[in-house]
């Protein structure tokens, strides 16, 4: 026989999400104390989460088709699975207006789909009396898609921002999950972006973009630039950037993931070597975001800060406004790896992590 095992598998299932707090349909209250006139009065205190009587069960429907094949005396085994998982009535603790007296409320916010293929290969290339080598390889391809967002179409319905990192994620109907959303880093302002005034100061050239509503006279060489994608201009026709220039700048979801495991056995000894890999995903580097910038007194920074842009002339110990001198102090100032004032959610902190 060619096959030691040949099996076709088809499965369907549905399940809820049990990782949700209890009784979120009800609004809870606590007690507090209020002193007045020398007396202590007991009052009620609202909780943090407002109940939602319209909550529905979150439900995931799973369809799976698989094929298992074993040959060569089961020394080579291959498993292939195709799956399609659809989650509806997703339950998320959403922020709500403070005017309600609460901060959050569990809501059914939408539906998503995860579809993909998983391949597992197990083999025993060598098997002798004293020595055995067995190897396992797996690779998985997953594609997510937001199928629906319930009850809204404004940006606040699909834009989530982490407070600590200030990195935004855009959740958009018809698009995959994991989209990084922010400004596109465009390097630093260099001396070529400015004109030297007769009094020794400098000013930003016309046509060079700046932050909307920010005084162009305050922009300095070494400040960070972002791309003005929306076409907005100021009163003088100069391009400006703002929150309207945010766009998708990466995706945290990999194109595929996998692993390779090898076990070598010799008599009573064994050695296992394994590796995992992820290809095509972007990573937000919070260390770059947190430890790069001009406002880091009395704390450590990353080594990249040693190559930061400087406005201080070491000959005088003071800030210089002479553009020629600044160019001398900052050779390669147009190199995108130089930095000084990095803030906000932007593409500088996003990198390919394959």
Where are these regions (language model features)?
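Outer/extracellular conduits and scaffolds centered on Gram-negative outer-membrane beta-barrels
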Residues: 1-33, 47-49, 53-354
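Charged, low-complexity intrinsically disordered boundary/linker segments
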Residues: 36-40
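Catalytic-core segments of enzymes that bind and process phosphorylated/nucleotide-bearing substrates
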Residues: 41-42, 52
